Design a protein with these regions (language model features):
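A short, active-site helix/loop in glycosyltransferases that binds the activated sugar's phosphate group
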Residues: 33-56, 193
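Carbohydrate-associated surface elements
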Residues: 42, 60, 69
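Conserved donor-binding/catalytic core segment of Leloir-type glycosyltransferases
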Residues: 77-95, 100-104
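Nucleotide-activated donor-binding/catalytic signature segment of Leloir-type glycosyltransferases, i.e.
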Residues: 82, 116, 122-147
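Conserved acidic donor-binding segment of nucleotide-sugar-dependent glycosyltransferases
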Residues: 197-206, 213-220
Length: 252
């Protein structure tokens, strides 16, 4: 395909693992690229045999949208009593819902929001839906998401089997940080949390539940400013400025 295109320079932006495709596809693209952007150190290391010109540009988030303090409480949340803990993202077939299911059953007085399209093939989805304190809701527009997250007491990050072994920080995390709310995430057995000073990292459903309890007991404003600052540093405008600087330095 590249042979059929006319271009002055070739840039490859690698933001995910493509191991499900023939490896020579990405290898040939990386070899041909004048400059490669990688979203994580792991991806950069993976691509390094094929390029000596790789720049690390992590994912980012829309900080201005998720950091606003004037967002309205969505109608479906008006009647909720008690703490609200929310997950933002698709409930895919390989999303591990076990930590959420365990915590929802342990705390029937808490509310859990799953904000995204739900795949019926997920093996725990029916059991999660059966919990009276869990709401699975597909949003009509992503523009609604900041309103929902603004009124969550804790933001939740769950694991997808396809991401096992990857070190890519999803944009979801930066959106969570931009709200300033406590964040509780599941971690793989050998995974190191990227933001250990502001995110609670769990390795089992039981520890996930305990850390949700700690997050809800967190003193207001304790580290919310630090979380927002991490979100601000990862704003897409900052990422774009860094890309522009790298391109200018490289002479593109």
């Amino acid at each position: 395909m590249l042979d059929a295109l006319s271009y002055g320079a070739l840039l490859y932006d690698c933001d995910r693992d493509w191991s499900q495709y023939p490896i020579h596809w990405e290898s040939e693209l990386t070899l041909a690229a004048d400059l490669v952007f990688a979203a994580s150190a792991g991806l950069a290391d993976h691509l390094s045999p094929c390029s000596g010109n790789i720049a690390l540009i992590p994912n980012g988030g829309n900080h201005p949208m998720f950091s606003r303090d004037d967002l309205s409480r969505p109608l479906p949340m008006l009647d909720l009593e008690g703490p609200v803990l929310g997950w933002a993202g698709a409930v895919s077939a390989d999303l591990d819902l076990a930590p959420l299911l365990y915590t929802a059953r342990a705390h029937p007085d808490w509310n859990f929001l799953l904000l995204g399209a739900a795949d019926p093939a997920n093996p725990l989805l029916d059991r999660v839906r059966a919990c009276p304190n869990v709401i699975v809701r597909q949003l009509d527009s992503l523009l609604e998401l900041p309103d929902y997250l603004a009124w969550c007491d804790v933001c939740l990050n769950l694991l997808r089997e396809r991401d096992n072994g990857l070190d890519i920080v999803p944009s979801r995390i930066y959106e969570y940080l931009s709200t300033g709310h406590p964040v509780v995430t599941m971690l793989w057995p050998d995974q190191v949390e990227h933001f250990p000073d502001v995110i609670y990292g769990a390795h089992s459903p039981e520890s996930f539940c305990r850390l949700c309890e700690q997050a809800l007991a967190e003193a207001p404003g304790w580290v919310s400013g630090r979380r927002r600052n991490y979100g601000r540093q990862a704003a897409w405008s900052h990422r774009a400025a860094e890309v522009d600087r790298i391109l200018s330095t490289a002479g593109f």
